[in-house]
Every structure is written in structure tokens, then in C-alpha cells.
Regions:
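Blade-level signature of beta-propeller repeat domains, shared across WD40, Kelch, NHL, RCC1
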Residues: 301-337
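Loop/turn segments within WD40 beta-propeller blades
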Residues: 49-55, 96-102, 138-143, 179-185, ...
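Conserved strand-to-loop turn within each blade of WD40 beta-propeller repeats
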Residues: 61-64, 107-111, 149-152, 190-193, ...
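WD40/WD-repeat beta-propeller blade N-cap
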Residues: 39-46, 85-92, 128-134, 169-175, ...
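A short beta-strand motif characteristic of beta-propeller blades
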Residues: 36-38, 81-84, 123-127, 164-169, ...
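WD40-repeat beta-propellers
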Residues: 67-72, 114-118, 155-159, 196-200, ...
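Intrinsically disordered, low-complexity acidic/Ser/Thr/Pro-rich linker and tail segments
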Residues: 1-43, 48
Length: 337
């Protein structure tokens, strides 16, 4: 079954009490007065940033073949401690934290391996050699399974305990970012055909094909409240979908280049999106209105909101004055620089 993107009441559909509360909260967040801080440590550009489930640690994955874990104080200016995770022999393209454990992190690399690390010791505890260069990775919300996508459009699902493949599937089309919904019963794949393929989990049977965009879909984010998913596309648009109806309820139009990365904040009231445009857009999910733009100096690779605070980590292709990779990421949302 194919679902056409019918747009439901595009500007500000009837709001629930909860949504009104989120809009009230917007008035309390002085985005214009907030600052970004730089975090330097990698030798080459950073491809991926991700927060742990408690919002106290941030991991960064880099072309320099390492990941790093940083202790972040949301309200402090304390000394930033970081620990290096070494072992991959190619770029660390994406990483994600165990949603139930604040110190376990999984990394996907071009060296064909997926590794599980303990962020306290910096040691690799599990490793799986897969069939191709891994570029996308995500955890099931209960922390029991990890899904990995590679450059050859193959999906592998690993059992976290044994670190062995449970499912393998090769697709005959371009598969980009992947995600479970908040229940873990639905698995979503973005594709180069402009669709989102919706599969039931664990059977991986096709439930739906959502015709989301006129160009390839690159990235996907799930609203933490489980109400929506958002899709970023090569057509420069971000679309917002009601997950129960599979209807498009909003589009965000501020970017002009293919959307590379998107993220919902912890309330689900804001969405950040980034591309090769030299700013990150933050928009109100319910009104579709852009509320702030964070200037950047390069194309962005990864944005992710903290799960507890309005802190947004972001990383891109920043160069220094000698045109070498800066190896930096930044966090926006501090009251002082």
C-alpha cells in the first residue's frame, strides 16, 4: 500500500493542551541569548555526535578512526574530561548509545566492524565483523537489538547480548538512515526513492510505503513522545508525519540544500535540521515556524539534541585557516560562551 503525502491543515492544526504547553515553553527559551561552545580533540572531521540516555555524556565519531566520549555539565563550566575509544581502522561514521545504559555505546565504521564500548573504561567489549562498510546504526528502544546499515544497502540486526546477527536483509534500492519507533514494533528505512519503508518488527514484513519526498530521503528522527517521525530529503525539505495515521502534518522549508541531519528536542516541540546551508535551523514542530538559526562555517554532518536539556550538539566539515580538518564539534544552548 502506498500512502500519498496529503498535507493535513498545514499551518498550525488544532493544538492539544500538551502542545500549547510546549508553545508556552518556547517563549521561555531565549534562543537569541544562547551560545555555542567548541570541543576540540579529533584530528579529522567529526561525522557523528550522540548523547547518552541521561544527557551527561556526548560521544563523537570521526574520520580519524576514533570515537571520543565527553563529560558535559549542562549548567557548569567545569573541566571537560574526554576519553578516546581506539580500535577501528577506518572512519567512525555513526554511533549511538544504549537507550537503557548510560555508559554503553555502539560504533559503526567503514572497516566493516560494529563495536560495543564501555564509556567508563574506554574498552571495546564486543565486536562484530559484517559484510560491508557500515554507515548507519541505531538501537532498539529497549536496548536489546542494534540495526546497522552499510554502503551496499544491506541491513543487519544484531542481538546485543551475544553480538551475533539476528536478521540480514539486502535491499534492491538505496537505503539511508534507519530507526525504530518508540514501541520497537515498527522499523523505518529512508530510501533513495523518496520513500520511507515501514516494516513490522521483528518480522521485517512490509507494512507500508510512505511516498514522502520528490527526491531521496536521507535522514529520519523519531519524536521522543512517539507521536511523529520526521524525514530530511535531498529536495531540501523536512517533512513531519503522524506515526499512527501515516499522514504528513507539517513541512519545514528553511534549508536550500539536501537535508543531511535532523533531531527532535527532548519535549518533541522543536526540530533542528542541517545541510550544506551555513546555518542550522530550529523550528517549532507545531507551527512550522523557524524560531532560531545557528550560524555555521561549513556543511553539517550531524545534529543531536540532549535528551534532558535544550542543548544541541552539532558537527560538520569545519576547516582551519590552513584548510585542514578542524576536528571540532560544538554544543549550542549555554547561557555563556
Amino acid at each position: 500500500m502506498q500512502v500519498q503525502p496529503r498535507l493535513q491543515r498545514h499551518r498550525g492544526w488544532p493544538l492539544t493542551t500538551e502542545q500549547r504547553g510546549e508553545m508556552e515553553e518556547e517563549k521561555l527559551i531565549p534562543f537569541k541569548n544562547l551560545h555555542s561552545r567548541d570541543y576540540q580533540g579529533h584530528k579529522k572531521k567529526v561525522h557523528s555526535v550522540a548523547w547518552n540516555c541521561t544527557g551527561t555524556k556526548l560521544a563523537s565519531g570521526s574520520v580519524d578512526q576514533t570515537a571520543r566520549v565527553w563529560h558535559i555539565e549542562p549548567h557548569g563550566h567545569g573541566k571537560i574530561k574526554d576519553i578516546e575509544l581506539k580500535g577501528h581502522t577506518d572512519s567512525v561514521d555513526q554511533l549511538c548509545w544504549d537507550p537503557k545504559h548510560a555508559d554503553l555505546i555502539a560504533t559503526a565504521s567503514g572497516d566493516k566492524t560494529v563495536r560495543l564500548w564501555d564509556a567508563r573504561s574506554g574498552k571495546c567489549s564486543q565486536q562484530a565483523e559484517l559484510s560491508g562498510e557500515n554507515i548507519n546504526i541505531t538501537y532498539k528502544p529497549d536496548g536489546t537489538h542494534i540495526a546497522v546499515g552499510n554502503r551496499d544497502d544491506e541491513l543487519t540486526v544484531l542481538d546485543v547480548r551475544k553480538f551475533k546477527p539476528l536478521h540480514r536483509r539486502k535491499f534492491g534500492y538505496e537505503v539511508n538512515e534507519i530507526a525504530w519507533d518508540t514501541t520497537g514494533e515498527m522499523f523505518l528505512l529512508t530510501t533513495g526513492n523518496g520513500t520511507v519503508e515501514v516494516l513490522s518488527y521483528p518480522s521485517l514484513q512490509a507494512l507500508d510505503t510512505v511516498m514522502a519526498h520528490t527526491a531521496g530521503c536521507y535522514c529520519i528522527a523519531i519524536d521522543p513522545k512517539g507521536r511523529y517521525f520526521a524525514v530530511g530529503s535531498a529536495d531540501s525539505l523536512v517533512s513531519l508525519w503522524d506515526i499512527s495515521e501515516m499522514l504528513c502534518v507539517q513541512t519545514f522549508t528553511k534549508l536550500e540544500w539536501p537535508v543531511r541531519t535532523i533531531s527532535f528536542n527532548h519535549t518533541g516541540g522543536y526540530i533542528a535540521s542541517a545541510s550544506e546551508d551555513l546555518f542550522i535551523d530550529i523550528s517549532n514542530v507545531h507551527t512550522g515556524r523557524s524560531v532560531h538559526q545557528i550560524p555555521c562555517r561549513a556543511a553539517m554532518n550531524s545534529v543531536e539534541w540532549n535528551p534532558k536539556y535544550n542543548l544541541l550538539a552539532y558537527a560538520g566539515d569545519d576547516k582551519n585557516k590552513y584548510q585542514a580538518d578542524e576536528g571540532v564539534f560544538r554544543i549550542f544552548g549555554f547561557e555563556s560562551a
